[in-house]
């Protein structure tokens, strides 16, 4: 069991006094994640801007755990909570999107994907319509190479600005990000703060039509009005995760308050009172049944974070304790 957030802040007494952002001990992550489940962050920090974030990183000893989250759309937090500091970039300091030249946009890491799509439409830049259908923020999109409708984040990235654990600035090229399917090999210790995107001039009517098609498709096939974290598993090579889940008889499968959506069975939903343990157990049960049915090993797309409650554990489907 982790100690209280107040105790952690007391240990750092004086180190954090000059920060302008908000420090909140023992904050429920169920208020942040779209699943509306999970234990508390020991301390939540919301920096005012990049300078404030840098000062925070320079003040916090590297042995103290630190986790960065965005708008919470792709996170499953375990019920024992998240030790150390959880950093959440605010829309006020990191959420702006601006056109910097004819074909380029700069976006803060806390900007919702939809805001980037809207800014691109206003600027007459094609190639960003897919963001209109992704329920997340740009920081997460950069980290996992988010994509939809056959387009990926890596196709639009010019460079990414980031801070390391020492608070130093780094500028990463597209190649530095090491993109692959739903993955970036950039150091997990880097905190992305903004990105420079490159688009292609296009007709606004065509861009708007593409965005409308994305939105219509999403509302037609995805449980957009449920408490969900988005796609649960990455698509295996040569097939779709939802097809394998369906073939294994897992559409609508429930564990406690967690369910694989009847509408789109690669989406886990919280039906009202699911715990983090319910959600993760359901996911591992689905992985086991798919493997038994087809020999395919599904890999989590949702990020699982934090500690189990005392006395709890979950076996991965191959019998390995996680």
Curated annotation (Swiss-Prot):
The gene is murB. The active site is at 182, 231 (proton donor), 301. Pathway: Cell wall biogenesis; peptidoglycan biosynthesis. GO terms for molecular function: FAD binding; UDP-N-acetylmuramate dehydrogenase activity. Belongs to the MurB family. The lineage of its organism: Bacteria, Pseudomonadati, Pseudomonadota, Alphaproteobacteria, Hyphomicrobiales. The keyword Cytoplasm applies. GO terms for cellular component: cytosol. It comes from Brucella ovis (strain ATCC 25840 / 63/290 / NCTC 10512). Its main location: cytoplasm. It is an enzyme of class 1 (oxidoreductase). It catalyses: UDP-N-acetyl-alpha-D-muramate + NADP(+) = UDP-N-acetyl-3-O-(1-carboxyvinyl)-alpha-D-glucosamine + NADPH + H(+). Cell wall formation. Keywords: Cell cycle, Cell division, Cell shape, Cell wall biogenesis/degradation, Cytoplasm, FAD, Flavoprotein, NADP, Oxidoreductase, Peptidoglycan synthesis. This is UDP-N-acetylenolpyruvoylglucosamine reductase. Residues 36-202 form the FAD-binding PCMH-type domain. Its cofactor is FAD. Gene3D superfamilies: 3.30.465.10, UDP-N-acetylenolpyruvoylglucosamine reductase, C-terminal domain, Uridine Diphospho-n-acetylenolpyruvylglucosamine Reductase, domain 2.
């Amino acid at each position: 069991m982790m100690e209280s957030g107040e105790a952690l802040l007391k240990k750092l007494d004086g180190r954090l006094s000059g920060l302008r952002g908000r420090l909140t001990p023992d904050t429920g992550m169920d208020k942040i994640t779209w699943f509306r489940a999970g234990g508390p962050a020991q301390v939540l920090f919301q920096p005012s801007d990049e300078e404030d974030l840098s000062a925070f990183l320079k003040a916090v000893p590297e042995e103290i755990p630190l986790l960065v989250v965005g708008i919470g759309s792709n996170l499953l937090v375990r019920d024992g909570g998240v030790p150390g500091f959880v950093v959440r970039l605010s829309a006020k300091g990191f959420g702006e999107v601006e056109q910097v030249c004819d074909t380029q946009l700069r976006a803060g890491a806390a900007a919702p994907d939809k805001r980037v799509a809207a800014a691109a439409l206003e600027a007459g830049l094609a190639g960003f319509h897919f963001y209109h259908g992704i329920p997340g923020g740009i920081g997460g999109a950069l980290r996992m190479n988010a994509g939809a409708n056959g387009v990926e984040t890596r196709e639009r990235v010019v460079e990414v600005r980031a801070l390391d654990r020492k608070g130093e600035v780094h500028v990463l090229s597209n190649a530095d990000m090491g993109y692959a399917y739903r993955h970036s090999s950039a150091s997990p210790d880097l905190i992305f703060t903004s990105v420079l995107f490159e688009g292609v001039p296009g007709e606004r009517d065509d861009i708007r039509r593409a965005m409308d098609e994305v939105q219509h498709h999403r509302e037609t096939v995805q449980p957009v009005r449920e408490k969900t974290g988005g796609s649960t598993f990455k698509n295996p090579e040569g097939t779709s995760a939802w097809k394998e889940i369906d073939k294994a008889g897992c559409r609508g499968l429930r564990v406690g308050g967690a369910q694989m959506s009847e509408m789109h069975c690669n989406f886990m939903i919280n039906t009202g009172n699911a715990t983090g343990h319910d959600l993760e157990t359901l996911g591992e049960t689905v992985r086991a049944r798919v493997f038994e049915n087809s020999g395919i090993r599904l890999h989590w797309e949702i990020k699982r974070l934090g500690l189990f409650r005392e006395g709890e554990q979950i076996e991965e489907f191959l019998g390995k304790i996680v």
